[in-house]
């Protein structure tokens, strides 16, 4: 039986297909015969610290349950010393490729790069993947390609109509789908991104403009790859990422020779060592929220010293801290002390089911004050009250109506649509449920500690 989430009943034989978050939250996992982790380089925290900590937690949890494991990843130079001995495994490095890659430099006058790209798209034959630095750049390229659209491109007109009706007709993706140009970046809903990949592989979309999201585990049938930018956002990519991008050209049994057109010099040839925080436990790359999940005998001496203050304190049990995966112990304890010292605050958080406005605002203010430490806007949100407003708006307003309301205030439809989608991806689908349940558990722990059962909350429904 295929199991993708914890609500499914298990059979005698099961295949689990889980995201790292679902793997961490999955209760009572049975013994596992074989655990496979694809793209294991994401264990390294240098690109995305928060997601890497979650993946390390999932890796640790599953290795405890699995008889065997198999980690896969491209272009890896080595793994940390001692890792094979600790986990009883062997690292095998290979340069084998199923297709031949032709690297073709592209010269463009300064300021005329986009014009040269459009000319190149007229010159190439076959399905063409275009890599660029950001969603904004992707939209710009899609728009220009759509303006130069050929009547020979089949496109996906029915999909374009549906997207226009449910999101907004002026979103660049709509123009692209009509003109045979797909788009793929991290702000898009996964279903729409997969729709574009499907249309590209079926030949309905001869061009697919993407950011770095497409190189992470998405299979395409591209004869050509055009590497237009040498950056991801504002940071220059390394040789590892460059290799991953150019590796999207060609496809075994489909295109045996892949053409890679590059607008910039390739980076210096240096492949990475993958850091694995759950093993190294380096203070600079391993969060305390990860360390607190490890069994004591798996902790290094320096890690035990880091965790000692949390085991000595009495305001919040280690069990509660561990249940709140991904939330730093010091932040949880700070909130626990705050609630214990201000009983009136507990009353504002003591609700069950659906909150009213004042309860929702109290929760969002608490989340923002204690758990959010990133500077500036986070997923389109700038404060606790802003978060509460946007969640309340989502509860009572269809997505298309939300977009229309924002556009009436003035603004670019592309930016408004994608900012709204980024909010949904970051908050309702990821951060908010996890952080809200963290507040709920801490609130209940303090209410019980103060012998106030009437102030116990229940946010799950």
Residue ranges: model-predicted function:
Residues 42-46, 216, 251:
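Residues immediately C-terminal
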Residues 31-36, 207-231, 258-263:
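A short beta-strand element within the Helicase C-terminal
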Residues 16-19, 36, 67-74, 207-210:
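Structural recognition of the conserved hydrophobic beta-strand(s) that form the central parallel beta-sheet
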Residues 301-461:
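C-terminal accessory/interaction regions of large nucleic acid-associated machines
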Residues 78-123:
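Interdomain hinge/linker at the junction between the two RecA-like core domains of SF2 helicases
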Residues 20-23, 27-68:
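SF2 helicase catalytic motif II
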Residues 1-15, 24-27, 108-117, 122-209, ...:
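Conserved C-terminal RecA-like helicase domain
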Residues 61-77, 224, 231-278:
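Conserved segment of the helicase C-terminal RecA-like domain
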């Amino acid at each position: 039986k295929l199991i993708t989430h914890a609500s499914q009943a298990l059979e005698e034989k099961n295949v689990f297909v889980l995201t790292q978050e679902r793997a961490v939250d999955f209760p009572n996992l049975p013994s596992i015969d074989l655990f496979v982790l694809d793209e294991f380089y994401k264990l390294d925290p240098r690109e995305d610290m928060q997601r890497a900590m979650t993946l390390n937690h999932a890796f640790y949890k599953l290795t405890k349950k699995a008889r065997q494991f198999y980690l896969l990843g491209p272009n890896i130079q080595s793994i940390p010393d001692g890792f094979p001995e600790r986990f009883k495994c062997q690292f095998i490095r290979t340069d084998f490729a199923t297709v031949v890659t032709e690297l073709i430099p592209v010269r463009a006058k300064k300021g005329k790069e986009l014009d040269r790209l459009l000319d190149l798209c007229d010159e190439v034959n076959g399905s063409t993947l275009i890599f660029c630095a950001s969603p904004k750049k992707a939209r710009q390229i899609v728009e220009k390609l759509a303006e130069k659209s050929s009547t020979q491109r089949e496109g996906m007109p029915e999909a374009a109509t549906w997207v226009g009706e449910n999101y907004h007709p002026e979103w660049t993706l709509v123009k692209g789908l009509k003109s045979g140009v797909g788009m793929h970046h991290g702000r898009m809903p996964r279903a729409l991104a997969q729709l574009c990949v499907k249309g590209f592989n079926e030949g309905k979309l001869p061009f697919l403009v993407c950011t770095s999201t497409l190189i992470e585990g998405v299979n395409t049938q591209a004869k050509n790859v055009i590497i237009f930018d040498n950056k991801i956002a504002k940071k220059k990519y390394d040789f590892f990422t460059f290799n991953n991008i150019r590796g999207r050209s060609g496809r075994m049994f489909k295109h045996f020779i892949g053409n890679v057109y590059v607008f910039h010099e390739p980076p210096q040839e240096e492949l990475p060592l993958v850091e694995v925080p759950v093993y190294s436990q380096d203070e600079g790359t391993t969060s305390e929220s990860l360390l607190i999940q490890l069994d004591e005998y798996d902790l290094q001496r320096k890690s035990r010293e880091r965790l000692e203050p949390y085991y000595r304190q009495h305001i919040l049990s280690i069990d509660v801290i561990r249940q709140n995966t991904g939330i730093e112990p010091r932040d949880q304890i700070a909130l626990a002390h705050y609630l214990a010292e201000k009983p009136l605050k507990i009353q504002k958080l003591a609700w069950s089911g659906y909150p009213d406005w004042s309860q929702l605002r109290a929760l969002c203010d608490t989340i923002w004050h204690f758990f959010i430490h990133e500077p500036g806007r986070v997923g389109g949100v700038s404060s606790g009250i802003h978060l509460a407003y946007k969640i309340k708006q989502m509860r009572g307003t269809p997505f298309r109506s939300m977009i229309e309301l924002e556009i009436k205030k003035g603004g670019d439809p592309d930016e408004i649509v994608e900012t709204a989608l980024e909010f949904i991806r970051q908050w309702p689908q990821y951060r908010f449920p996890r952080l809200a349940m963290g507040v709920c558990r801490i609130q209940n722990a303090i209410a019980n500690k103060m012998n106030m059962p009437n102030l116990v909350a229940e946010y799950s429904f």
